[in-house]
Amino acid sequence: MADAKELKQVLTGPIINNNPIALQILGVCSALAVTSKLETALVMTIALTAVTAFSNLFISLIRNHIPSSVRIIVQMTIIASLVIVVDQVLQAYAYAISKQLSVFVGLIITNCIVMGRAEAYAMKTPPMMSFMDGIGNGLGYGAILLSVGVVRELFGNGSLFGVEILSKISDGGWYQPNGLLLLPPSAFFLIGGLIWLIRTYKPEQVEAKG
């Protein structure tokens, strides 16, 4: 049984020390697409965290009974089943957001973070540690999404969660929204800036030359 210190490290490690987007460069595609609004970024974070945590848990529970030759198929079946459940829940209780997220919830099935943790961690680790690892990686993914989402929605539309923060000129205020921040390429540059900041703060994460 893992002790509290180990569980804490597994839970918090992926947020800064081994962030799946900023340091492993995984899950970038969805980060570019769903961060124009903080609301969609938050829902995507919750969806991916739930899928990663529970897929890790279920795969870890049966890891000793999965033949090596079909392990990827088993992993994808479990992940796909969880994604379908999440998608149906979103359509039932948050239909408008589900429409905004479009295909990106379904594409969690092939998300590198989910697949990577299932194969590299859950297949070799007890259930509780695997579950916490899934939550930790989901939170790490969410930390980047929400950071980018705040900048894009605040300065691109003058609002957060749809609530006006900066009064727009068109409404008699002072702020002129920067429409470029609402385009997917802006997220690419913002994520690049976050990667630079994190690697400046943690130089040990920079790959050795030569």
From Swiss-Prot:
EC number: 7.2.1.1
GO BP, sorted A to Z: sodium ion transport
GO cellular component: plasma membrane
UniProt entry tagged with the keyword Cell membrane: yes
GO MF annotation list: oxidoreductase activity, acting on NAD(P)H, quinone or similar compound as acceptor
Segments traversing the membrane: 14-34, 42-62, 72-92, 96-116, 131-151, 178-198
Keywords attached to this entry: Cell inner membrane, Cell membrane, Ion transport, Membrane, NAD, Sodium, Sodium transport, Translocase, Transmembrane, Transmembrane helix, Transport, Ubiquinone
Reactions that this protein is recorded to catalyse: a ubiquinone + n Na(+)(in) + NADH + H(+) = a ubiquinol + n Na(+)(out) + NAD(+)
Chief location category: membrane
Mode of membrane association: Multi-pass membrane protein
Location(s) in or outside the cell: Cell inner membrane
HAMAP family: NqrD
Quaternary structure, from the entry: Composed of six subunits; NqrA, NqrB, NqrC, NqrD, NqrE and NqrF.
Family to which this protein belongs: Belongs to the NqrDE/RnfAE family.
PANTHER family assigned to the protein according to its UniProt record, in alphabetical order: ELECTRON TRANSPORT COMPLEX PROTEIN RNFE, NA(+)-TRANSLOCATING NADH-QUINONE REDUCTASE SUBUNIT D
Function according to Swiss-Prot or TrEMBL: NQR complex catalyzes the reduction of ubiquinone-1 to ubiquinol by two successive reactions, coupled with the transport of Na(+) ions from the cytoplasm to the periplasm. NqrA to NqrE are probably involved in the second step, the conversion of ubisemiquinone to ubiquinol.
Name of this chain's protein: Na(+)-translocating NADH-quinone reductase subunit D
